[in-house]
C-alpha cells in the first residue's frame, strides 16, 4: 500500500510541476507575440527590429525578449539607419545592407555601428552582391 501511495504521490507531484511549467509563458512565445504585435502596427519596424536582435543574439548573447526588442527599436543607433534603408532602398538593398551590418557588428561599439556598416557596404564585394541580387530579381520578373 505504501508503494502505491508513494508512486501515486510522485505521479501527482510530477503532473503538478508539468502543469505549472506549461502555464508559464515561455520567452519565445512572449517574443513571438511582441513581434506579431509590432508587425500589426509597423511591419517594417518588426522586420528591422527582429533582424537586428537576431544578429545581437548570435554575436552578443542579447536575449530575444519583448524588452530587448523594444530597446533595439528605441535606442540602437542601427535601427534608424536600417529603417531608412528599408523604406528607401527596397528589399535587395536592405538585405545586402543588413549583411554589411552583421559583418560589422561589435558588441561594445554600438554608437559607431552605422558608420562601420556604411563603409562595409561601399566595398566592392557588397556592391557586387547587390548587383547580383537586383539582376536575379529582374531576370525572374522577365
What are these regions (language model features)?
Residues 1-11:
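Bacterial N-terminal signal peptides that target proteins for export
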Residues 4, 27-28, 35-36, 75, ...:
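Intrinsic-disorder/low-complexity regions
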Residues 29-88, 105:
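Short N-proximal segments of mature Sec-exported proteins
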Residues 22-24:
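Bacterial signal peptide processing site
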Residues 67-142:
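Compact alpha-helical subdomains of small soluble proteins
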Residues 17-20:
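C-terminal motif of bacterial Sec signal peptides marking the signal peptidase cleavage site
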